Amino acid sequence: AIARPVPTDSIAPLFRRRSNPDAFERISRTVPGGFASIERDSTGRFVVRMVDTTKADTIRAALREPFTAGRSPVVKAGILRELATARAERVSWSMAQLIDWNDYVATFVIGGPAVVGVGVNVHRQRIEVDVADENGPDVVEARLGSRRIPCGLVVIKITGPVRLL
């Protein structure tokens, strides 16, 4: 069973939220431990990334349902075995926190010709703002400069203009 929502230092109350979060976002928002992601390492083993690794067992248990729903009994058993031994890795930001910061940042940078995209990179633990050209970083920095966003959380990448196909 999923625990009741955990109080966080979320900035979500500052702006309107998207609706219909996926299963992983729901786990991040409701299960203690600050779930960020689940990935495979270079050896193929599951790694569960979270803010508080002392809550690893709780997060692993919460991941069982979304990872096994609709799977055959044999596949389900294999996944459950792997989840039980998944390595816990500490990260700075939960998925929910990254999504909230992304939505907050987007409210200030979307809407001009300089910015072509904004998104969460959960693996790299950051918000990525894609800009059209070399003037874009200055525009983004001017829009975000007084917003008290944590240092290193936002990365600006020059990707070029959007091209319609």
Predicted feature locations:
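N-terminal presequence-like segments and adjacent domain-start helices
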Residues: 1-19, 78-93
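Compositionally biased, intrinsically disordered/low-complexity regions enriched for serine, proline
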Residues: 2-4, 147, 158
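Soluble non-cytosolic domains of exported or imported proteins
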Residues: 14-21, 53, 134
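Short, flexible domain-boundary/linker segments around small modular repeats
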Residues: 18-20, 24-31
